[in-house]
Amino acid sequence: MSERDDRAAFLAANDVSRETLDRLDRVIDTLDVWRQKSNLIGPKEWPQIWTRHVGDSWQLLDHIPETAHLVDLGSGAGFPGLIIAAARSLGHVTMIESVGKKCAFLRAAIQEADLSAAVHQGRVEAAPPIKAEFVTARAFAPLPELLDYAAPWLRKGAVGVFPKGERWNEELTAARQRWNFAYEAIPSRSGGSGVILIIREVARRND
C-alpha cells in the first residue's frame, strides 16, 4: 500500500474535518522532508504512516477535550503530540524532547501547520513547570518509569492517556508496586491486544 492509499484508509475510518486534515497534511509533509535527513521514521514504516502512526495517535482524542492543555513526554517524531495539536486547535500541547534534531523538526512542523503547540528541549525530569491537565507519551518508557516521569503533573490532578502494547498488564502490575492510582484500560483500535490506559488519582505508595 502506498502512503497515498494509507491516507485514504485512515480518512475512511475516521471523521476528520477539512481544517484538521489540512493541518495533518502539513505535519506529514514536513515529516516527509525531515525524514530524508534525520532518523525520524524508518523507510519500512512510511507506507503505513497514516494508519499506524497518525491513527494510533488519533484514537487518544476520544479522551482529550477540545480546549485541553497537554504535555507530551519524549515526543520524538511528534506522535501523538503533533497529531493532538492538529486536532485540538483550541487547546495547547507542550512537547518535551531531549534530542536536538527532533526538536528542530517538531518546531518546523508546528510553524508549517500553524499549531497551538510548543517544544521544550531537555530531559523530562528537568522540565520547568508546565501547565497541563493531560499527559501523553507513546513508546517512551514502561509504565512504572513513565509514572515517575509524569508524576509532576499526575500528582496535581492531571490525567494520563497512555497507549500501551500487549504487555500492558505486566507493566500495570509492576507500576502498582510503587504507585496507587485509578485506571481504565480501553482496547486499542490499532489492533492486537494493546490498550489505551487512562490513569487518574496518582499517589506514591509511601506518601
UniProtKB/Swiss-Prot annotation:
Enzyme's top EC category: transferase
Keywords, comma-separated and alphabetical: Cytoplasm, Methyltransferase, rRNA processing, S-adenosyl-L-methionine, Transferase
Gene3D superfamilies for the chain: Vaccinia Virus protein VP39
Location within or outside the cell: Cytoplasm
EC number(s) recorded for this UniProt protein: 2.1.1.170
SUPFAM superfamilies: S-adenosyl-L-methionine-dependent methyltransferases (SSF53335)
Keyword S-adenosyl-L-methionine assigned: yes
Main location: cytoplasm
Protein's UniProt keywords contain Cell membrane: no
Cellular component GO terms held in the UniProt record: cytosol
Molecular function terms, GO-annotated: rRNA (guanine-N7-)-methyltransferase activity
Residues annotated to bind S-adenosyl-L-methionine: 74, 79, 124-125, 138
Reactions catalysed, as given in the entry: guanosine(527) in 16S rRNA + S-adenosyl-L-methionine = N(7)-methylguanosine(527) in 16S rRNA + S-adenosyl-L-homocysteine
Domain of life where this protein originates: Bacteria
Function: Specifically methylates the N7 position of guanine in position 527 of 16S rRNA.
Matches recorded under NCBIfam families: rsmG_gidB
Family label: Belongs to the methyltransferase superfamily. RNA methyltransferase RsmG family.
PANTHER family documented for this protein: S-ADENOSYL-L-METHIONINE-DEPENDENT METHYLTRANSFERASES SUPERFAMILY PROTEIN
Name of the protein in its database record: Ribosomal RNA small subunit methyltransferase G
Organism of origin: Hyphomonas neptunium (strain ATCC 15444)
Lineage of producing organism: Bacteria, Pseudomonadati, Pseudomonadota, Alphaproteobacteria, Hyphomonadales
